Amino acid sequence: MEIILATETWQMAGAWYVRIQAMAKKHHITLDREFDALDGPDMRYILALDGDFPVGTARLYPLPDGESMMIGRVVVLPEYRHKGLGTAIMAACEAWIRDLGCRTAVLESRDNKTEFYAGMGYRITGDAFIDGDTFRCIRMEKRL
């Protein structure tokens, strides 16, 4: 298993493939809702590969405060879950955030995944909200 910073078109396509397979198809999310204006050529993606096959991803983008980065769309294909890959993807995100000079990682967790992130040191910093009429989410943060 390898985790990389997606910088080439094929790598970004791999990140999108994982999101389509694990989120859009499973949860019946239309592509125009899964892929928003942030998913452009300047988006930063982490990609987990099993050989050449994409199996997990996350995206990162800076927040207006200049000190924080949002981690979003953290997804692992179902057959690769519960093997530490999500934790490894998050560690890669946090390392990249530090390398970019930011001090806080922010995410909006689905309410049934907050324990996963709390186990990595994230704390709840906001009230629950509905994201895209699909998921109940909660904002969480971690100082790096």
Predicted regions and their residues:
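Short amphipathic alpha-helix that is part of the acyltransferase structural core
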Residues: 1-34, 39-40, 45-53
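Conserved active-site tyrosine of GNAT-family acetyltransferases
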Residues: 19, 117, 122
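Conserved beta-strand in the GNAT
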Residues: 47, 53-62, 68-75
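A conserved beta-turn-beta hairpin within the catalytic core of GNAT-like acetyltransferases
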Residues: 62-72, 81, 131-137
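Conserved acetyl-CoA-binding loop-helix of GNAT-fold acetyltransferases
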Residues: 76, 82-95
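Conserved GNAT acetyl-CoA-binding A-motif
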Residues: 90, 97-110
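Conserved catalytic-core motifs of GNAT/GCN5-like acyltransferases
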Residues: 108, 123-139
